[in-house]
């Protein structure tokens, strides 16, 4: 590799003859070293030849420069949610007023505000099910004090036209999903007189106090589990915990590992039934699930009316 001196002109290379003290007219006995060809660089006027001091990186912002705050609180989609009253949220999401004692305090928590804002951001970039007005449809069929049975699902159906806010349910005119067909088969095994409905709308169950709720309340089209990290599970868990403390003798049907991990009612105060998931992909034959019979036996034993599982 070439050095800087290699690029100097030949005039820059001089031979300095070795001299002795006598030749210099000096009596000094200090030996001199031999100086070979050198690259002679004259310092600039005012310089001493020492290396220049290192430039330090400036700290802070230049004068007159200010950063724009991009935190959550200043995002236009966040501002509305953070300032919304319960009435605003109730109206926007079509929540039944009877659920205010269960939901109001939780809906004002910071994590719910972030959750709803993230939901709005997702809606701006992808198709989300169910429609916003149906996310809390599970509140509109029975007030909290009338809930007797809680069936916990995972997340909504992800195909167009299926999800409408009730776990495992689809509206009339929509083909009955395989999981719901297996649920119907389990009911029929416990109640031979049960007739398989031609539709999958579970409204009649919900009106009798069967809470059909998913742990995740929204999903992106064609992407099951895509909204599992938004925070819905925390809100649903709070709702279930609140129901457990305000009611006695609830029946919980927890199907599959996900439901069983996300919900842990006090077994001393409530009946907790567990089984495999009704999905056809489950290793367990859901047709043998006895929960519908066991739930009614428990309700009757505790002096309450059993659920009529027949759907017209």
From Swiss-Prot:
Region called Disordered, residue ranges: 1-61
Active site residues of this protein: 155
Gene Ontology biological process: base-excision repair, AP site formation via deaminated base removal
Primary location recorded for the protein, binned into one broad class: host cell
Matches recorded under InterPro entries: UDG_fam1 (IPR002043), Ura-DNA_Glyclase_AS (IPR018085), Uracil-DNA_glycosylase-like (IPR005122), Uracil-DNA_glycosylase-like_sf (IPR036895)
Residue ranges, compositional bias (Polar residues): 22-33
First-level EC class: hydrolase
Cellular localization per UniProt: Host nucleus
Keyword Repeat: no
Reactions performed catalytically: Hydrolyzes single-stranded DNA or mismatched double-stranded DNA and polynucleotides, releasing free uracil
Keywords: DNA damage, DNA repair, Host nucleus, Hydrolase
GO molecular function, one term: uracil DNA N-glycosylase activity
E.C. code: 3.2.2.27
Single GO cellular component term: host cell nucleus
Family assignment from sequence similarity: Belongs to the uracil-DNA glycosylase (UDG) superfamily. UNG family.
Task of the protein: Excises uracil residues from the DNA which can arise as a result of misincorporation of dUMP residues by DNA polymerase or deamination of cytosines. Therefore may reduce deleterious uracil incorporation into the viral genome, particularly in terminally differentiated cells which lack DNA repair enzymes.
Name of the protein in question: Uracil-DNA glycosylase
Gene source species: Equine herpesvirus 1 (strain Ab4p)
């Amino acid at each position: 590799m070439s050095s800087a001196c290699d690029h100097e002109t030949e005039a820059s290379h001089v031979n300095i003859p070795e001299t002795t003290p006598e030749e210099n007219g000096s009596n000094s006995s200090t030996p001199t070293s031999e100086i070979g060809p050198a690259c002679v660089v004259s310092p600039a006027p005012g310089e001493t030849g020492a290396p220049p001091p290192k430039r330090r990186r400036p700290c802070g912002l230049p004068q007159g420069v200010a950063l724009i705050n991009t935190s959550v609180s200043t995002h236009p989609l966040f501002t509305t949610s953070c300032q919304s009253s319960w009435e605003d949220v109730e109206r926007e999401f079509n929540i039944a007023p009877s659920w205010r004692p269960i939901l109001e305090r939780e809906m004002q928590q910071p994590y719910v505000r972030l959750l709803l804002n993230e939901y709005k951001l997702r809606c701006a970039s992808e198709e989300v099910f169910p429609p916003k007005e149906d996310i809390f449809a599970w509140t509109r069929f029975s007030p909290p004090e009338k809930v007797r049975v809680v069936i916990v699902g995972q997340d909504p159906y992800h195909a167009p036209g299926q999800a409408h806010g009730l776990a495992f349910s689809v509206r009339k005119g929509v083909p009955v999903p395989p999981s719901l067909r297996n649920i119907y088969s389990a009911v029929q095994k416990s109640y031979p007189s049960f007739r398989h409905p031609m539709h999958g709308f579970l409204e009649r169950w919900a009106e009798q106090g069967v809470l059909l709720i998913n742990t995740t309340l929204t999903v992106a089209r064609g992407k099951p589990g895509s909204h599992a990290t938004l925070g819905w599970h925390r809100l649903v868990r709070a709702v279930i915990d609140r129901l457990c403390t305000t009611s006695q003798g609830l029946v919980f049907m927890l199907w599959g590992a996900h439901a069983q991990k996300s919900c842990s009612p006090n077994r001393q105060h409530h009946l907790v039934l567990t089984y495999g998931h009704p999905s056809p992909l489950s290793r367990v034959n859901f047709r043998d699930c006895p929960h519908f019979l066991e739930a009614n036996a428990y309700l009757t034993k505790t002096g309450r009316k059993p659920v009529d599982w027949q759907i017209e």
